[in-house]
């Protein structure tokens, strides 16, 4: 299993728009075979950092999702929404592997 961790720098004045964006992506990742672990929005501390975590069985499965999402109308609508609302300033993507006890 591989877990994609996204760290977003968001516009804190557009938090509601970012939450809408997040809710768009959760079912999309799951439709493409991923397991979404949720978005984590600012509560205390920095008001412009948000996280998202989702997993795929392998990096190859993730790459298939990335390729298919480029051609999916709902995914493109989510990207367009983020562009139009400018709720995301920047983001970085990391891949992690879980360790269980």
Predicted regions and their residues:
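Short, surface-exposed ligand-recognition loops at beta-strand->loop->(often short) alpha-helix junctions
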Residues: 10-20
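Long, low-complexity, Ser/Thr/Gly/Pro-rich intrinsically disordered segments that act as flexible linkers
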Residues: 92-101
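An amphipathic, aromatic/His-enriched active-site/gating alpha helix that lines ligand/cofactor pockets
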Residues: 20-37, 55-92
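Short, structured motif recognition centered on aromatic/hydrophobic residues
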Residues: 2-7, 18, 29, 50-53
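Short beta-strand-to-loop capping motifs
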Residues: 7-12, 54-58
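Short acidic/glycine-enriched loop/turn segments that link adjacent beta-strands
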Residues: 45-48
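Residue-level signal for secondary-structure boundary sites
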Residues: 14-16, 60-62, 101
């Amino acid at each position: 299993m591989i877990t994609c961790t996204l760290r977003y720098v968001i516009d804190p004045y557009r938090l509601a728009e970012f939450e809408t964006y997040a809710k768009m992506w959760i079912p999309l990742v799951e439709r493409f075979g991923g397991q979404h672990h949720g978005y984590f929005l600012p509560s205390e501390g920095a008001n412009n950092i948000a996280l998202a975590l989702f997993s795929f069985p392998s990096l190859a499965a993730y790459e298939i999702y990335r390729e298919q999402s480029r051609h999916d109308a709902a995914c493109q609508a989510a990207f367009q929404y983020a562009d139009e609302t400018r709720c995301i300033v920047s983001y970085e993507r990391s891949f992690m592997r879980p360790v269980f006890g």
